[in-house]
Amino acid sequence: MSQYVVCALYKFVELENYQELREPLLALMEAHGVHGTLLLASEGINGTVAAKREGIDTLLAWLNDEPRLNGIVYKESYSDTQPFNRTKVKLKKEIVTLGVEGIDPRHVVGTYVKPQDWNDLIADPEVFVVDTRNDYEIEIGTFKGAVNPNTDTFREFPDYVKQNMDPEKHKKVAMFCTGGIRCEKSTAYMKEQGFDEVYHLEGGILKYLEEVPEEESMWEGDCYVFDGRVAVNHQLEKADYDLCNACRLPITEEDKRSEQFEQGVSCPKCFGKHSEEQVARFREREKQVSLAAVRGEQHVGGESAKQRQQRRAEKLAKKDVQRKQA
């Protein structure tokens, strides 16, 4: 069985004085080996974290003990290695950034559709199916027949709707995203724009892959995830992708065989797009990563800081011994 539990969670709820949650939440995560990032805002909480079973259970218990966060929505998958290097709790204006004022899924939202009912909905020729994720995510996998809005960030989605969709023409709209949170915002936005029948996949793609057998599935490809696994397959296991450390886009084994690929410096998607200064910086970073690997250490994250401190302490102790022997 995989060693780490990866937990994606969110809840839209009014969090007055949300800033006060940051320190106790961060302290609990650090004390129980929970890595990843949580976002706090006045509209709620969102994030993905990973830890051993005990760490995730402790975090979820803490969140459910907070009255405003009780009943938080979460989905679990698994990883053989820790997919995050750091532990962060960030304060934000929005927990998922649409960039449109006044959109509140707590008051207006689309109709939730269970994974078991999703196939029938998107097979309906009268339903316009939209993937609300970014272009690089959709490139890895999507639902059969879904429209790609060709967005680089979620902030671009409202412009896509304004330029390409019409409430009179698109009377039934079905939307989906990785874990469900982007659709909370996007369906709320579309309802505000006058679209009447707006549906979204409850629990997102991850819940669909978990509950719908692959032989019945309308999902094609793999699912991009925002952690070290890069993507997961239909069994929610790590798929055959890595991340280019220069552009942070997913790459395949074929990409790595390209002449334009240099580990940590470039890939076919970003080759020639970085300045000479950036390339030099990437090469130096890759050199430090390699040196850390030789020492059996991490180059980034909380553990790397501890390892550097330990190395410095050992050097100082050695110098002290040499001084006393002199």
Swiss-Prot record:
Q: What ranges does the record list as Basic and acidic residues composition bias?
A: 311-326
Top-level taxon in the UniProt lineage: Bacteria
Q: A biological process (GO) annotation for this entry? A: tRNA modification
The entry's keywords = Oxidoreductase, tRNA processing
User: Its catalytic activity?
Assistant: uridine(34) in tRNA + AH2 + O2 = 5-hydroxyuridine(34) in tRNA + A + H2O
Question: Quick check: keyword tRNA processing in the entry?
Answer: yes
Keyword tRNA processing listed? yes
Q: What is this protein called?
A: tRNA uridine(34) hydroxylase
